[in-house]
Design a protein with these regions (language model features):
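An extended, acidic
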Residues: 9-125
Length: 125
């Protein structure tokens, strides 16, 4: 993935405690999902709400480390996958499965595979 002809790179950071996390809004989660989301939020350095799709672009840039969302539709996330993965990041559902048209609506995007793995561990602990 490139921006103005330059390859996008992600941050080398692999620690959730120092990364910025983003989500559209806290009301996008069911009660059970919010408990899992809140555990991940507590492990991250900072949280921002309201960036919507812009947050995924920031994941590709490496400015945001993790985006965790729910209640998503395929048109919300499918076009973002190649951008993030092309920049070296990873995007799956909360179970770590590839996103498809039949996915459950949960999305976990991370700037690095290490951040993604750490976030998955917390979401599924």
């Amino acid at each position: 993935t490139t921006f103005r002809g330059q390859p996008l790179g992600n941050r080398p950071e692999a620690a959730l405690k120092t990364c910025v996390m983003s989500a559209t809004a806290p009301d996008m989660f069911s009660a059970a999902q919010f408990e899992r989301f809140d555990a991940l939020r507590a492990a991250c350095g900072d949280l921002g709400y309201g960036a919507d799709a812009y947050a995924y672009g920031l994941v590709a840039l490496g400015t945001v480390g993790v985006v965790a969302e729910a209640s998503m539709n395929p048109w919300d996330f499918m076009a973002l996958i190649p951008v993030i993965e092309g920049a070296g990041g990873r995007v799956t559902d909360w179970a770590g499965e590839p996103l498809t048209l039949e996915s459950d609506g949960t999305v976990l995007a991370a700037a690095t595979p290490a951040l993604h793995q750490a976030a998955l561990h917390i979401l599924n602990d």
